[in-house]
Amino acid sequence: VVNWFKKNKRDLPWRNTSPWGVMVSEYMLQQTPVNRVLPKWHEWMERWPTPKHLASATPAQVITAWGRLGYPRRALRLHAAAQIIAEDFNNQVPEDQETLQLLPGIGEYTAAAIAAFAFEQRSLVMDVNIRRLLVRAIDGQEHPKPAPTAQEKARRLAILPTKNAHVWAAATMELGALVCTSKNPSCELCPIIGQCNWRKNGYPRTELVRKSQDWQGTDRKCRGTIVQALRENESLTESAIKKLWPDESQVEKALKTLLEDQLIQALPRRRYRLPQ
């Protein structure tokens, strides 16, 4: 797997950057594909090359710069984390996973990924691509469970290399992303096809649990429409915002949750803007 990775890996900029660059990429990649993250990551690193630079920005600048990456709360959490790092950690991303998890927006997975890819630590990175590759190769199943169980973590930790575990993590992640894909995997290109238990078992199918709600009518789509309009305007009245969406009650709900998440600010005379 590692030899395959050395020959076939993508030239992703956060593989040759500072710990801060790795951290920014991990926030962006949490729920957004690589091809959409690439241009935004370059923009952010050019504009805010260290935590201190981002810490000095306003929330409105941060949300606007986040663009259409989705889930803009990630931008505010990254902004808050940058302020803590600049103030409490001398502008240096902490190396310890427990300390990393104290920062806004960093859970167990993101802390493990930063530890591995920024500091070359032996940490258990349980990315969806890694999980899918290993559940097929080792367990002979098509797809992993929605969330890793304690048993799965223990089994994966048992096979984690003692040396260069960060390279193993990057290699298995890349193999899962490029070859052992969720749909239509390119098994003929896989370097471990001879050891794959899913193949040996005759490729048994596993039904994926999928959300049924159409994105176009979701509350998240409504929220995104409002935030995008406020990126493009200094402020908007509630009546103007309601014209952006066919369901007024959904707009009212979206405004309420956006205020709770501190993604927008209420102004006098029922106007709204991005937080300053």
Which functions belong to the PLM regions below?
Residues 3-221, 229-249:
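Catalytic cores of DNA base-excision repair glycosylases
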Residues 245-259:
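Short amphipathic alpha-helical interaction segments
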Residues 259-272:
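A short, conserved structural fragment
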Residues 275-276:
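C-terminal engagement modules used by replication, chromatin/transcription, nuclear envelope/ESCRT
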